[in-house]
Amino acid sequence: MKVYIETMGCAMNSRDSEHLLSELSKLDYKETSDPKTADLILINTCSVREKPERKLFSEIGQFAKIKKPNAKIGVCGCTASHMGADILKKAPSVSFVLGARNVSKISQVIHKEKAVEVAIDYDESAYAFEFFEKKAQIRSLLNISIGCDKKCAYCIVPHTRGKEISIPMDLILKEAEKLANNGTKELMLLGQNVNNYGARFSSEHAKVDFSDLLDKLSEISGIERIRFTSPHPLHMNDGFLERFAKNPKVCKSIHMPLQSGSSAVLKMMRRGYSKEWFLNRVERLKALVPEVGISTDIIVGFPNESDKDFEDTMEVLEKVRFDTLYSFIYSPRPFTEAGAWKERVPLEVSSSRLERLQNRHKEILEEKAKLEVGKTHVVLVENRREINNQIVGFEGRSDTGKFIEVACKEKRNPGELVEVEIISHSKGRLMATTKGN
């Protein structure tokens, strides 16, 4: 039997799709890249914005037209969590609905017709399904916490993923060792508030924090690099930043989700920090790690965002000069505080602001790329590049998170760490050769 999985959204969803495949492999399902040949089609959904939800029902309609006569369609993930049985009403071709915290129950629901499984289980026994058999890969996703206790006014995640619980460190270390023995060189640690790790366990455990976990993971033989997403700026205190800077295996790239550069908007968003506080954290980080790569999220058009508020966001963009920007127009979500507000920034205003923000960021990337020429980086080889079956190089990421295309006729295997020199750039992209060539 064959299964096709369409994955939308964040890294947590990618990890959930891996889990779905692992569970289904026990039932002799094999993954296929062609939905027309699948016996089971799964759509792993995202509900952070409205656009992916609209896309969901369009995809369901397309899959219903092309699927095999007896093939089933299942909807999983965050949209499944908050819409539940309403999905079955809107899309009769769907056979079952499986929430974001119910992935391990896929083997139960595929044999039921019109099943809905979205209830959240907070018992520690649920940890057993956080780890599962994974195929060998250089870069592995590793969950360290589930859920979110923050109450940001715009965000539906606490409703779809449940309250925040940290996975016991001994279980995480055991899984990381297994991944290392299977060839993993880089870990990507996952959590909705990943750097708040240790704030709450579902039962009594020794007091540890995120920095403690990073140090322990760094001791595992075979693990060369550690990244993590998504942290919250509130938990980036001096102690964390200092240990982040000192740990040689922790990559010197970090996600710092700003959301808005306006203190007034940040207060409405319930983010818990101000523009000045955020800039102070960036200043402290850059003092410790001058070459650090910083990515961020920015929402434009949040209710009541004024022209002055948006200019504050542009000011932060200029001061920080983010290496990566994920930017969106505000999307009202159900089960959120802001979703009930009547105030709305006109779409044409929001669209204009987004365009200006993104255009300026593209310019910043080009300016930063020029400064990279002549610099050296150590790249973890992710993929070989071939033309007409001839090796022409490889691609991968630097310690600071820069994606680099490397020209090299020598065979370099995925997982190798290679020193390269930047020789050119184009539209923010970096090209390099191996050091000494």
From Swiss-Prot:
The UniProt entry lists the main location of this chain as cytoplasm
Domain annotation Radical SAM core: ranges: 134-367
| Residue span, TRAM domain | 370-436
Reaction catalysis annotation? N(6)-dimethylallyladenosine(37) in tRNA + (sulfur carrier)-SH + AH2 + 2 S-adenosyl-L-methionine = 2-methylsulfanyl-N(6)-dimethylallyladenosine(37) in tRNA + (sulfur carrier)-H + 5'-deoxyadenosine + L-methionine + A + S-adenosyl-L-homocysteine + 2 H(+)
Q: Which residues bind [4Fe-4S] cluster 1?
A: C10, C46, C78
Where found, per UniProt?
Answer: Cytoplasm
Co-factor requirement: [4Fe-4S] cluster
> What GO molecular function annotations does the UniProt record carry, in alphabetical order?
4 iron, 4 sulfur cluster binding; metal ion binding; N6-isopentenyladenosine methylthiotransferase activity
Q: Which GO terms describe its cellular component?
A: cytosol
PANTHER family found in the cross-reference section: CDK5 REGULATORY SUBUNIT-ASSOCIATED PROTEIN 1 (PTHR43020), MITOCHONDRIAL TRNA METHYLTHIOTRANSFERASE CDK5RAP1 (PTHR43020:SF2)
Q: Which family does it belong to?
A: Belongs to the methylthiotransferase family. MiaB subfamily.
Q: What is this protein called?
A: tRNA-2-methylthio-N(6)-dimethylallyladenosine synthase
Give the gene name.
miaB
